[in-house]
Amino acid sequence: MYTFYALLNRMKLIARWSLMRSTTKEDLMQHAAHVAIVGQALGIIRNTYFGGNVDTDKIAALALYHDTAEVVSGDLPTPIKYYSPRIKSAYSEIEDVINGKLLESLPPEMAEKYAEYIRPDTDTIEYKLMKVADKV
């Protein structure tokens, strides 16, 4: 049985910054939607005002899937995740293993398509704009 969509449905159950005090609660699904909206806007601004030629739909799709590993790992607050290069590297390895398992929960022909968003090429302008949006 393929469980990819059931696993992604958990995004609405994963609280972000759960270990930190926050005035507004946000779940992983809300965060992904926010990053998609801001990222796509950044791409449209770049294309409209700065002569860019970025795929704004790809930015939005990258944003929707950028934290999918957290449906298994939960949210690790940014100050911890980036505390040291060693911790960042270890956490990246954990996320990669989880993302591999998520892709295995799809039929192979579909996993190939989703891999573009779950294990993206981090050198593209679309990915870089999505990461900027993730920090807003």
Label each residue range with its predicted role.
Residues 43-47, 71-80, 106-115:
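Membrane-helix exit/interface motif
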Residues 4, 28-31, 59, 91, ...:
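Amphipathic alpha-helix face/heptad-repeat signature
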Residues 1-19:
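Short alpha-helical hairpin
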Residues 54-60, 104-136:
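Histidine/acidic-rich helix-loop-helix segments that form or flank divalent-metal centers
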Residues 2, 22-29, 123-127:
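Short, solvent-exposed segments of well-ordered alpha helices
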Residues 81-101, 127-128:
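Divalent-cation-assisted or electrostatically stabilized phosphate/pyrophosphate-binding catalytic cores
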Residues 23-57:
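Alpha-helical phosphate/pyrophosphate-handling elements in metalloenzyme active cores
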Residues 37-43, 57-76, 131:
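Active-site alpha-helical segments that house and flank conserved acidic catalytic motifs
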